[in-house]
């Protein structure tokens, strides 16, 4: 049996399968199919729209008996670069759901495009933004470069622990 399920289609049948096998589920915010999502970045209010989306899906999953849900805010999926940065800055607001928040920004275009580099060259920018993600509520980082992410988390933890003294 799989350890974890994620699917950005949010298919009700998939939710039933997740419930049946008592699997953790990563619930990602996404507005559309991959080939159309970047055409659908106009939100009346990004945060209210996302909160409503998550509330609806979480209710459905809970009603089916799914206990382990992780929120993925869907960086890069149906959001402009500006929306992605605002989302990173304000992701702590999604703690209202009392669920772990997964942040997946590693090598995303929001990093490499403004730096005019390739995705494979975006390690420094990724590390820099991972620290902000942790500061702003990320519990889980989805990464490409595991050792570098572990180093970032270790240094961030030292920083946070020294802030408490």
Where are these regions (language model features)?
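Active-site-adjacent loop and "lid" segments of alpha/beta metabolic enzymes
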Residues: 3-63, 78-165
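Conserved Motif II region of HX4D acyltransferases
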Residues: 74
């Amino acid at each position: 049996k799989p350890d974890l399920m994620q699917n950005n289609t949010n298919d009700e049948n998939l939710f039933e399968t997740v419930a049946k096998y008592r699997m953790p589920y990563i619930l990602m915010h996404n507005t559309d199919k991959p080939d159309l999502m970047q055409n659908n970045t106009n939100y009346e209010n990004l945060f209210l729209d996302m909160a409503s989306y998550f509330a609806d899906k979480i209710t459905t999953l809970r009603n089916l008996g799914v206990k382990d849900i992780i929120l993925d805010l869907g960086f890069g999926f149906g959001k402009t670069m500006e929306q992605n940065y605002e989302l990173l800055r304000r992701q702590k607001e999604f703690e209202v759901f009392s669920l772990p928040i997964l942040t997946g920004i590693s090598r995303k275009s929001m990093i490499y495009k403004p730096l005019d580099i390739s995705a494979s060259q975006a390690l420094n920018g990724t590390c820099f933004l991972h620290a902000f993600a942790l500061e702003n509520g990320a519990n889980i980082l989805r990464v490409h470069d595991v050792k570098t992410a572990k180093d970032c988390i270790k240094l961030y933890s030292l920083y946070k622990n020294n802030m408490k003294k």
